[in-house]
C-alpha cells in the first residue's frame, strides 16, 4: 500500500474518466490507512462530490484535489 499517490492525467480528460481513476485507487485498496491521493487536473473540473474527497487547492488553471480513506 502507498502513503501518497500523485496522479497527473491529461488535462483534457473527461470528469467521468477522472472519477473512474479515483474510484479504482480505492476499489483496489492501494492507499495505506492514512494515505493520500492527489489528483492534478484543470480548474474547470470539480471533483468535490466524488467519494473520499477531502479538499482542493487551486492555482490558476490548475487544481490539486486530495482524497483519503475517511
Segment roles from a protein language model:
Residues 1-70:
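Class I S-adenosyl-L-methionine-dependent methyltransferase catalytic core
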Amino acid at each position: 500500500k502507498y502513503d501518497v499517490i500523485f496522479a497527473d492525467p491529461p488535462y483534457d480528460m473527461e470528469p467521468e474518466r477522472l472519477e473512474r481513476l479515483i474510484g479504482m485507487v480505492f476499489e483496489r485498496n492501494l492507499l495505506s490507512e492514512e494515505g493520500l491521493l492527489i489528483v492534478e487536473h484543470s480548474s474547470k473540473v470539480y471533483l468535490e462530490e466524488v467519494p473520499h474527497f477531502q479538499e482542493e487547492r487551486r492555482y490558476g488553471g490548475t487544481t490539486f484535489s486530495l482524497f483519503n480513506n475517511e
